[in-house]
Protein backbone atom coordinates (compact mmCIF):
# COMPACT_ATOMS: atom_id res chain seq x y z
CA UNK A 1 0.00 0.00 0.00
CA UNK A 2 1.52 3.29 -1.00
CA UNK A 3 -0.66 5.63 1.05
CA UNK A 4 -1.68 6.22 4.63
CA UNK A 5 -4.62 4.21 5.93
CA UNK A 6 -7.96 5.95 5.63
CA UNK A 7 -10.20 6.51 8.68
CA UNK A 8 -12.07 3.20 8.31
CA UNK A 9 -8.86 1.22 7.83
CA UNK A 10 -7.26 2.97 10.81
CA UNK A 11 -10.26 2.10 12.98
CA UNK A 12 -10.12 -1.55 11.90
CA UNK A 13 -6.37 -1.74 12.54
CA UNK A 14 -6.82 -0.08 15.95
CA UNK A 15 -9.50 -2.64 16.85
CA UNK A 16 -7.16 -5.48 15.85
CA UNK A 17 -4.35 -3.90 17.87
CA UNK A 18 -6.64 -3.61 20.90
CA UNK A 19 -7.63 -7.26 20.54
CA UNK A 20 -3.99 -8.31 20.25
CA UNK A 21 -2.91 -6.27 23.30
CA UNK A 22 -5.82 -7.69 25.30
CA UNK A 23 -4.65 -11.18 24.30
CA UNK A 24 -1.09 -10.48 25.48
CA UNK A 25 0.74 -8.68 22.67
CA UNK A 26 3.54 -6.40 23.88
CA UNK A 27 2.41 -3.43 21.77
CA UNK A 28 3.28 -2.48 18.22
CA UNK A 29 6.22 -1.51 16.05
CA UNK A 30 6.57 0.81 13.10
CA UNK A 31 9.17 2.35 10.82
CA UNK A 32 9.78 5.50 8.84
CA UNK A 33 12.98 4.26 7.20
CA UNK A 34 13.19 4.31 3.39
CA UNK A 35 15.02 1.00 3.24
CA UNK A 36 12.17 -0.85 4.96
CA UNK A 37 10.34 -2.18 1.95
CA UNK A 38 7.83 -4.90 1.34
CA UNK A 39 6.84 -7.03 -1.61
CA UNK A 40 7.92 -5.74 -4.98
CA UNK A 41 10.03 -2.96 -3.49
CA UNK A 42 6.97 -1.11 -2.24
CA UNK A 43 7.17 0.78 1.04
CA UNK A 44 5.93 -1.08 4.10
CA UNK A 45 2.45 0.30 4.76
CA UNK A 46 3.47 1.70 8.15
CA UNK A 47 6.05 3.94 6.48
CA UNK A 48 3.16 5.98 5.09
CA UNK A 49 1.23 6.24 8.37
CA UNK A 50 -0.07 9.72 9.09
CA UNK A 51 0.35 11.39 12.46
CA UNK A 52 -3.39 10.85 13.09
CA UNK A 53 -2.99 7.15 12.35
CA UNK A 54 -0.02 6.83 14.73
CA UNK A 55 -1.94 8.78 17.37
CA UNK A 56 -4.88 6.37 17.08
CA UNK A 57 -2.67 3.32 17.61
CA UNK A 58 -0.81 4.97 20.49
CA UNK A 59 -4.16 5.77 22.11
CA UNK A 60 -4.99 2.05 22.10
CA UNK A 61 -2.05 1.44 24.44
CA UNK A 62 -2.88 4.50 26.53
CA UNK A 63 -6.46 3.34 27.01
CA UNK A 64 -5.29 -0.11 28.15
CA UNK A 65 -2.46 1.25 30.28
CA UNK A 66 -0.12 -1.38 28.92
CA UNK A 67 2.12 -2.14 26.01
CA UNK A 68 5.13 -0.52 24.40
CA UNK A 69 6.04 0.90 21.01
CA UNK A 70 9.17 0.20 18.98
CA UNK A 71 9.95 2.47 16.05
CA UNK A 72 12.75 2.48 13.49
CA UNK A 73 13.17 6.22 13.59
CA UNK A 74 16.61 7.48 12.57
CA UNK A 75 16.98 7.84 8.80
CA UNK A 76 20.69 8.44 9.39
CA UNK A 77 22.21 5.96 11.81
CA UNK A 78 22.79 7.69 15.12
CA UNK A 79 21.24 11.02 14.05
CA UNK A 80 17.85 12.05 15.45
CA UNK A 81 16.38 14.81 13.28
CA UNK A 82 13.67 17.31 14.25
CA UNK A 83 10.79 15.60 12.43
CA UNK A 84 11.80 12.31 14.05
CA UNK A 85 11.76 13.98 17.47
CA UNK A 86 8.22 15.11 16.72
CA UNK A 87 7.12 11.55 15.90
CA UNK A 88 8.81 10.22 19.04
CA UNK A 89 7.19 12.88 21.21
CA UNK A 90 3.77 12.23 19.63
CA UNK A 91 4.03 8.51 20.38
CA UNK A 92 5.11 9.19 23.97
CA UNK A 93 2.42 11.79 24.64
CA UNK A 94 -0.41 9.88 23.02
CA UNK A 95 0.44 6.44 24.41
CA UNK A 96 1.83 7.42 27.80
CA UNK A 97 3.79 4.19 27.41
CA UNK A 98 7.47 3.36 26.83
CA UNK A 99 8.71 3.97 23.29
CA UNK A 100 11.97 2.46 22.12
CA UNK A 101 13.69 3.65 18.97
CA UNK A 102 16.57 2.64 16.72
CA UNK A 103 19.35 3.06 15.87
CA UNK A 104 22.21 4.57 17.81
CA UNK A 105 25.64 3.45 16.68
CA UNK A 106 28.96 5.26 16.94
CA UNK A 107 30.03 6.60 13.59
CA UNK A 108 33.50 7.35 12.27
CA UNK A 109 32.16 10.03 9.95
CA UNK A 110 29.98 11.87 12.52
CA UNK A 111 31.79 11.26 15.79
CA UNK A 112 29.35 13.27 17.94
CA UNK A 113 26.15 11.83 16.42
CA UNK A 114 25.16 9.65 19.37
CA UNK A 115 26.00 12.29 21.97
CA UNK A 116 24.05 14.92 20.04
CA UNK A 117 21.10 12.57 19.62
CA UNK A 118 21.05 11.74 23.32
CA UNK A 119 21.07 15.46 24.16
CA UNK A 120 18.27 16.15 21.71
CA UNK A 121 16.27 13.18 22.98
CA UNK A 122 16.83 13.93 26.70
CA UNK A 123 13.35 15.43 27.30
CA UNK A 124 11.76 12.42 25.60
CA UNK A 125 13.99 9.96 27.43
CA UNK A 126 12.69 11.54 30.64
CA UNK A 127 9.15 10.72 29.41
CA UNK A 128 9.96 7.07 28.69
CA UNK A 129 11.78 6.98 25.35
CA UNK A 130 14.50 4.34 25.21
CA UNK A 131 17.13 4.42 22.46
CA UNK A 132 18.42 1.09 21.17
CA UNK A 133 21.96 0.26 20.22
CA UNK A 134 24.16 -2.79 19.88
CA UNK A 135 27.30 -3.84 21.74
CA UNK A 136 28.69 -5.12 18.44
CA UNK A 137 30.01 -3.08 15.53
CA UNK A 138 27.61 -2.45 12.69
CA UNK A 139 28.67 -4.47 9.66
CA UNK A 140 26.81 -5.23 6.46
CA UNK A 141 27.14 -7.73 3.68
CA UNK A 142 25.85 -6.28 0.45
CA UNK A 143 25.06 -7.86 -2.88
CA UNK A 144 22.67 -6.96 -5.66
CA UNK A 145 20.23 -9.75 -4.80
CA UNK A 146 19.41 -8.00 -1.52
CA UNK A 147 20.35 -4.34 -1.98
CA UNK A 148 18.41 -3.33 1.16
CA UNK A 149 21.05 -0.88 2.36
CA UNK A 150 20.86 1.21 -0.80
CA UNK A 151 17.14 1.95 -0.40
CA UNK A 152 17.89 4.85 1.93
CA UNK A 153 19.50 6.77 -0.92
CA UNK A 154 17.22 8.78 -3.24
CA UNK A 155 19.49 8.02 -6.18
CA UNK A 156 18.50 4.35 -5.91
CA UNK A 157 14.75 4.97 -6.03
CA UNK A 158 14.50 4.32 -9.79
CA UNK A 159 16.31 0.99 -9.34
CA UNK A 160 13.79 -0.20 -6.76
CA UNK A 161 10.89 1.16 -8.81
CA UNK A 162 11.84 -0.84 -11.93
CA UNK A 163 9.68 -3.98 -11.73
CA UNK A 164 10.67 -5.37 -15.12
CA UNK A 165 11.90 -8.98 -15.18
CA UNK A 166 15.22 -7.77 -16.57
CA UNK A 167 15.76 -5.38 -13.64
CA UNK A 168 14.84 -8.05 -11.12
CA UNK A 169 17.60 -10.41 -12.28
PLM-predicted stretches and their roles:
Residues 1-71, 75:
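Catalytic pocket of metal/acid-base enzymes, prominently hydrolases
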Residues 1-8, 16, 21, 43-44, ...:
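Polyanionic/metal-chelating signatures
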Amino acid sequence: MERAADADETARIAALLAEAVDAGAFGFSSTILNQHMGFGGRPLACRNASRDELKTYANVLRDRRKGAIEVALTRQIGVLEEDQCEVLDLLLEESRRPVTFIALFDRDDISEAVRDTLKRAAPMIAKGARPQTSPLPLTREIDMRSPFSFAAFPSWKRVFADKSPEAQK
